[in-house]
């Protein structure tokens, strides 16, 4: 009886040890697989991050150099979608912000700091050009001026208003016409014509929309004003 009991004990211990060994081996395999998957996922994530194209301020195509402000803007689309003006990744004017309107939309920015000074829109179809002229005259030297049309930005423009905008660096303002699409970035006190201007004429033969040309867009890097 003692021999039989001892034999049972030996068998029980052997079964326990075998079971423990098998479980430990399976657990180790699962741990190795889990760690392998973890490392594989980490490597894949690193590859995705390294191949994902970088995003620059305002969604422009390349980074701006130091002491420059990134900007991107678009004119309105027909009389349906308002213009959009972005500077340094901050949307200054848009339909979502509910601060755009028919006519010429204007954002004024401090040329040294990039801080927003004011946003306005002036109805050049059914409005009066006089408030727009007074607004243009009051712009201080060193101010960055960004403009974009929506619907019609030209009907009420007179020679004085066009001259004041030309003094900000615009070339196209002299022949901006009814329902043309136009975006412009210039500055008060600028000594040369601005390189930042796009203009599409309203032409029934080439218009993208019925009665309006396609949206005009522009992006770039504005030099920061230095003392």
UniProtKB/Swiss-Prot annotation:
Pfam families for the chain: ILEI
Domain of life: Eukaryota
Keyword Magnesium (UniProt): no
Provenance organism: Bos taurus (Bovine)
Protein name, entry field: Protein FAM3C
Keyword field: Cytoplasmic vesicle, Developmental protein, Disulfide bond, Lectin, Oncogene, Secreted, Signal
PANTHER family: UNCHARACTERIZED FAM3
Signal peptide residue numbers: 1-24
Annotated localization: Secreted; Cytoplasmic vesicle
Domain named GG-type lectin: residues: 67-225
Entry's family note: Belongs to the FAM3 family.
Any one GO biological process: keratinocyte proliferation
Cystine crosslinks: 58-86, 64-221
GO cellular component: cytoplasmic vesicle; extracellular space; Golgi apparatus
Primary site of residence: secreted
